[in-house]
Amino acid sequence: MIKLLGVFFVPIIPFSFVVDYVFENCKSCRNYFFPVLVLLGVLVGALGVGKAGTLLILLAVLTSIAYTYRLFRVQNYEEWLLTYYIAVASLSWLHPEKMLFFISAFAIPLTVIHFLILHMKNQGAKPEVEEFKGIATYLPVLGTLAFVALVSSLVIAPAYAFFTLYGVFKGNLILTPILLIEWLVWLWVGFKMFSPVFFEEKAEAPKYEDLDFSEVFPLTFLLFLGLLLPVL
């Protein structure tokens, strides 16, 4: 039963298509769809799914490749979050015993990014590159948290995840280059999507407010947990 739920909450093809459909069509639940999905994924990892068979492993690798390729076509930050999460989380099926730690490494910083996006949406911003251009300059607290979360999700989390999977792809001449190429794509697309946030400016200052303490504290705490996870 847990494994059946797992293929939806730690999505792999074809079950990931259901996740895509709900995400695209449930506009009323869009703001909290992603954190609920990753929370359920963490729960599945905590409960344990047992060993993954050959078919499940093949589907997991196929899912990761397909969603990594899809990253080239994402149009906004919400699409990037979900697509990137599925691309990386699906690989946790290669080592289900470590699924909890694997997923958590990505879920924590990506959830922080989600709530930073939500903070902007609540002020009327659309989750698009043009809307977020230069935001880090005018909203330094949000910009700092976004930068740390981005580095954590694109650099620290994959490094930790690959260390977790080392025993799986060690000596595998097919899987190893696939994972390395995927990581390069994740880095390139991620920094390309977010570089306007940090390195470009709008013609006039945007009329958005920065985070207050009630928002900064829990997000900073989450980031601290994410950075601490690799040494646990």
UniProtKB/Swiss-Prot annotation:
<keyword id="KW-1133">Transmembrane helix</keyword>
<protein>
    <recommendedName>
        <fullName>Uncharacterized protein aq_836</fullName>
    </recommendedName>
</protein>
<feature type="transmembrane region" description="Helical">
    <location>
        <begin position="171"/>
        <end position="191"/>
    </location>
</feature>
<feature type="transmembrane region" description="Helical">
    <location>
        <begin position="42"/>
        <end position="62"/>
    </location>
</feature>
<keyword id="KW-1003">Cell membrane</keyword>
<keyword id="KW-0472">Membrane</keyword>
<dbReference type="GO" id="GO:0005886">
    <property type="term" value="C:plasma membrane"/>
</dbReference>
<feature type="transmembrane region" description="Helical">
    <location>
        <begin position="100"/>
        <end position="120"/>
    </location>
</feature>
<keyword id="KW-0812">Transmembrane</keyword>
<feature type="transmembrane region" description="Helical">
    <location>
        <begin position="145"/>
        <end position="165"/>
    </location>
</feature>
<feature type="transmembrane region" description="Helical">
    <location>
        <begin position="4"/>
        <end position="24"/>
    </location>
</feature>
